[in-house]
Amino acid sequence: RDCQEKWEYCIVPILGFVYCCPGLICGPFVCV
């Protein structure tokens, strides 16, 4: 899903956890 909070974690299996901003999708991975 899209990020809803300012610093919400996205899961990227290769890089581990990364931050993303509200309303953004982390590359091919979505926020959890």
Curated annotation (Swiss-Prot):
Any GO molecular function: sodium channel regulator activity
Keywords noted in UniProt: Disulfide bond, Ion channel impairing toxin, Knottin, Neurotoxin, Secreted, Toxin, Voltage-gated sodium channel impairing toxin
Consequence when changing residue 7 to A: 2.5-fold decrease in potency to inhibit human Nav1.8/SCN10A sodium channels, and important decrease in interaction with lipid membrane
GO cellular component, one term: extracellular region
Result for mutant: residue 6 to A: 1.5-fold decrease in potency to inhibit human Nav1.8/SCN10A sodium channels
Disulphide-bridged cysteine pairs: 3-21, 10-26, 20-31
Record annotation: effect of changing residue 29 to A: 6-fold decrease in potency to inhibit human Nav1.8/SCN10A sodium channels, and important decrease in interaction with lipid membrane
Domain text: The presence of a 'disulfide through disulfide knot' structurally defines this protein as a knottin.
Protein name as it appears in the record: MuO-conotoxin MfVIA
Protein's organism: Conus magnificus
